[in-house]
């Protein structure tokens, strides 16, 4: 009886270990894919942006990574559609950032109801 119980426990442990290994492998693969995509995007942006614009974007990425990501995507899209031509300078990047800020800003109003 105890041998069966031990065998069942060992089988459960083995399955859990396999599941954990599978998850870790999947997470590692996902991280590698993200790193590969990041490297591709960085290479594209190096060709599209001036050094000052890249510096501004790097500083922004430290403080507001989601805004930096949106700006990177916007620059790539604008160049692909021909709306701006490379190299994208710092002034153009600032204009793109201002436009992103305007489009994502939420105005809200606080109302206080008194009884």
From Swiss-Prot:
Keyword DNA-binding tagged: yes
Superkingdom assignment: Archaea
SUPFAM superfamilies noted in UniProt: Double-stranded DNA-binding domain
Similarity annotation: Belongs to the PDCD5 family.
Listed name of the protein: DNA-binding protein APE_1087b
CC annotations in GO: cytosol
UniProt GO molecular function: DNA binding
Claim: Methyltransferase is one of the keywords in the record: no
Signal peptide (from-to): none
């Amino acid at each position: 009886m105890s041998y069966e119980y031990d065998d069942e426990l060992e089988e459960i442990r083995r399955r859990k270990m396999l599941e954990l290994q599978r998850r870790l492998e999947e997470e590692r693969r996902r991280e590698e894919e993200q790193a590969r995509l990041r490297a591709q995007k960085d290479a594209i942006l190096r060709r599209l942006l001036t050094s000052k614009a890249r510096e501004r974007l790097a500083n922004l990425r430290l403080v507001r990574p989601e805004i930096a990501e949106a700006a990177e995507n916007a620059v790539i899209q604008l160049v692909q559609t021909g709306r701006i031509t490379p190299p994208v300078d710092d002034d153009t990047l600032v204009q793109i950032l201002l436009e992103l800020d305007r489009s994502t800003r939420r105005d809200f109003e606080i109302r206080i109801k008194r009884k």
